[in-house]
Amino acid sequence: MFIRSLGIYLPKERMGAEEIAHRAKLPLEVVKEKLGILEKPIPGPADHPAEMAVWAAEEALRGANLGPETLDWVISIVEEYKDYPVWATAPYLAQRLGAKGALGMDLNQKCASFLGALEVARGLMATRGAKAILVAGGYRNGDLVDYQDPHTRFLYDLAAGGGAALLTREGPGLRVLSLAHRMDPELALAVKVPVGGTRTPLSPEALSEFYLRVEDPQAMKARLDATSIPTFLKVIQEALEEAGYTSEDLDYLALLHMKRSAHRAVLEGLGLREEQSIYLERFGHLGQLDPILSLVLARREGKIREGSLVALAVAGVGYFYGAAILRLEGGVYA
């Protein structure tokens, strides 16, 4: 299976580090250096998650020079917080794109959803004869950030955008050599919007709590301090082993946005140099779309060339971890 082409949509509006610092009452240098945010895209009036997914998908189809009629499946990784509640988006993406013959599904692993979608797509190609699968998502969880809540400081980077990947059975493109996944159920309830579900239905009184919250900040910090970086390294190593490589063979690491020290810790753990990755300090965190954005930027900056070995690594609250090993074969990807 190959990643044949990619698409990214980013809103024009930006929130700078200065505004984040002002809202959160933090020193500017803490936002820039510790949190690793110089600026991030924020949504305009028309930038709804499913719409942004459509715009990114259109770019991916153009990049591969393929029409929507060629798609066998549409896998939507549009974020759970989206245009409408209790709404599946794969049919909408197919309708908007004109993929009338495609089958579809929605998939949600929070910020690890792209890796889950690659796993499902690989299975569809192996067992269902699929030849072309579109994975597309949109994200604007920045709406759910309460900058007055210091316990959610690690979420201040949440941004907005759309991303898509066109997967094909044949190349050229980034061949998916291996996938690896891990899950830590100890953090199952750690991060969530506490109102608006069946346990605490939305009401006028509950509106002020319609933000992402951390249930037990001290317990979550202790757990992540002990497990986060080691688990990132383990899942990447598992993917490398499945592909028959070691970290010494890697040319590029596409890593989701995280605080600057954590990004460096993952690179150091793999023995990689800083120039072998792109730190998304001008984009913030686009959730499950970070690896797509990183691959697009790496191609533009010449960090991925023919034969390059690439690792993707992600994590999503819940907690999910995932990694993939890719190799560019048969020409550049769009």
Question: Where are the predicted features?
Answer:
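Condensing-enzyme catalytic core mediating Claisen C-C bond formation in acyl metabolism
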Residues: 1-45, 151-223, 234, 327-334
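Acidic-glycine-rich active-site phosphate/pyrophosphate-binding loop
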Residues: 24-33, 84-98, 135-144, 204-209, ...
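Glycine/charged-rich beta-loop-alpha catalytic/anionic-binding loops adjacent to active sites
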Residues: 37-39, 73-76, 95-108, 144-149, ...
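Flexible, glycine-rich active-site loops centered on histidine and acidic residues
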Residues: 126-161
